[in-house]
Design a protein with these regions (language model features):
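Beta-rich carbohydrate-recognition and catalytic domains
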Residues: 21-176
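Bacterial Sec-dependent N-terminal signal peptides
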Residues: 1-26
Length: 176
């Protein structure tokens, strides 16, 4: 009986290791033309971290889910240097994800620097970033709209570009 339990345990561990190995995230680039690259991701992490160059021309980045609501985001992907990274959320629990990037050349630095991650460090390490006044964890904000008191809490609403430090990709969000 001990032999059977040992064999079953060995099989279970072997299966577990195989399962962990086969669910590893993988990113592959398919450069369809000089201005269109498709990023295929198997077993996506929470984010794809996009390398940003402040002075680069904007590229159009689209998480392609096949839904009518899919929208291009204008993002300054790194051409020759990486100034910082921004997280681009991937679908939770999906087996695969597709990201289409238009208007970024095949030789751009971003293709070597792009990475997958389940986390994004938002520690305040910037010398001039305020501690007392509200700022988003990353990105650009504008048009703070006063405090709104609702359900016993104050909310501050503002416009937000999560993909860079310049105007664009307007999202509305709030903090409590």
């Amino acid at each position: 009986m001990k032999l059977c339990k040992g064999a079953i345990l060995a099989l279970a561990v072997s299966y577990g290791l195989t399962y962990c190995h086969t669910t590893k995230s993988k990113l592959t680039l398919e450069q369809k033309s000089d201005s269109l690259t498709v990023i295929h991701i198997t077993n996506p992490t929470n984010y794809i971290l996009l390398p940003i160059e402040e002075e680069a021309a904007e590229s159009q980045v689209l998480l392609d889910t096949g839904e009518a609501a899919d929208t291009d985001m204008d993002i300054r992907l790194a051409q020759t240097q990486v100034d910082y990274f921004v997280p681009f959320a991937l679908p939770a629990g999906a087996k695969a994800a597709t990201v289409r990037v238009r208007n970024k050349s095949k030789d751009a630095l971003c293709w070597k620097e792009i990475k997958l991650s389940d986390t994004f460090d938002t520690a305040n390490t910037e010398k001039f970033r305020p501690v007392y006044h509200h700022t988003p964890l990353y990105g650009w904000m504008n048009d703070a709209n006063g405090l709104v008191y609702k359900d016993g809490e104050y909310h501050l609403y503002f416009q937000y570009n999560p993909y860079g430090s310049k105007w664009g990709n307007m999202h509305w969000t709030f903090c409590q």
